[in-house]
From Swiss-Prot:
Cofactor notes: Binds 1 [4Fe-4S] cluster.
Organism: Sulfurihydrogenibium sp. (strain YO3AOP1)
Gene: nuoB
Name of the protein in question: NADH-quinone oxidoreductase subunit B
Broad class of the protein's primary localization: membrane
Molecular function as annotated in GO: 4 iron, 4 sulfur cluster binding; iron ion binding; NADH dehydrogenase (ubiquinone) activity; NADH:ubiquinone reductase (non-electrogenic) activity; quinone binding
Length: 171
């Protein structure tokens, strides 16, 4: 964005959409273990995610960010995939904690070894459990990623055939 000397802001539609998307994230949380408690603490008054435009939603159909917090077991994986598919585009995923990111400290047969095996993940937040500051860091990293991504489609040149001069029909 650029501002002229007369106070007029010059920008593109793509930049306005990017600004709106990154400054009004509506996450839906899938709290599966102790990381969910830290996620709730992040939304409380001390950290206040509302000031960043982050409003937690109860339905995936109203959300654009999925925060997976905690251990994902194989039995829950299809439901998590369904929640992801119900979200409208564009959508982003944050994997919160070591259990969601890599399966946790004890790799066992019912535990999914990373949520990225079933849905694409945009930001990984380390920790067991991650602190509220770490979740805020992850959200800010996601905002940087949204700002850097270009949403518009590339223009392609389509060759145009110019009709040749028509010749009069002779009788």
């Amino acid at each position: 964005m650029a501002m002229t000397s007369s106070g007029i802001i010059l920008t593109t539609v793509e930049e306005v959409l990017s600004w709106g998307r990154r400054n009004s994230l509506w996450p839906v949380s899938v709290g599966l273990a102790c990381c969910a408690i830290e996620m709730m603490h992040t939304a409380a008054s001390r950290f206040d995610t509302d000031r960043l435009g982050i409003i937690f939603r109860g339905s995936p159909r109203q959300s654009d960010v999925l925060i997976v917090a905690g251990t994902v077991v194989n039995k829950v994986a299809p439901m998590l995939r369904l929640i992801y598919e119900q979200m409208p585009d564009p959508k982003w995923v944050i994997s919160m904690g070591g259990c969601a990111s890599a399966g946790g400290p004890f790799p066992t047969y019912p535990t999914l070894q990373g949520v990225d095996r079933i849905i694409p993940v945009d930001v990984y937040i380390p920790g067991c459990p991650p602190t509220p500051q770490a979740l805020l860091w992850g959200i800010l990293e996601l905002q940087k990623k949204i700002k850097a991504k270009k949403e518009g489609k590339e223009l392609i040149e389509i060759p145009i055939k110019v009709p040749q001069e028509s010749k009069p029909i002779s009788k």
